[in-house]
Amino acid sequence: MVFQERTYSVLIVTASDTFANSVMPLLPMTDYWPVTIVHSISEARRRVVDTEFDIVLINAPLPDDFGMRLAIDICTNSGAGVLLLV
């Protein structure tokens, strides 16, 4: 069996640049690329429609909603793994 390397696309949804900056070192570009950072639920919904992500990190609460409904919708409608951080 041949091992194939894979990179995972990541969407980070957070109102805080501090959170995004603290998570980025945990996501090396060799394994996680591209990493997209958005700052609102509405922007995240637009990105999810346009791009298929493997992993979605939601740092709740967000300015326009808590984030739970977004997490449920992404889990229901895509194959992405979702982590809701409160």
Where in this protein do the model-derived segments appear?
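Structural motif
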Residues: I12-D17, H39, I58-L62, L85-V86
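A generic structural motif
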Residues: T30-V35
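Acidic, metal-coordinating helix/loop segments flanking the phosphotransfer/catalytic sites
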Residues: I37-I55
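Short alpha-helical
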Residues: T18, E43, D65
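Non-catalytic signal-transmission and effector/linker regions of two-component phosphorelay proteins
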Residues: M1-P25
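Alpha-helical interaction/dimerization surfaces of two-component signaling modules
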Residues: P25-M29, R47
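Conserved phosphotransfer microenvironments
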Residues: D54-A80, V86
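Flexible, charged surface loops at secondary-structure boundaries
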Residues: F3-T7, V49-E52, T76
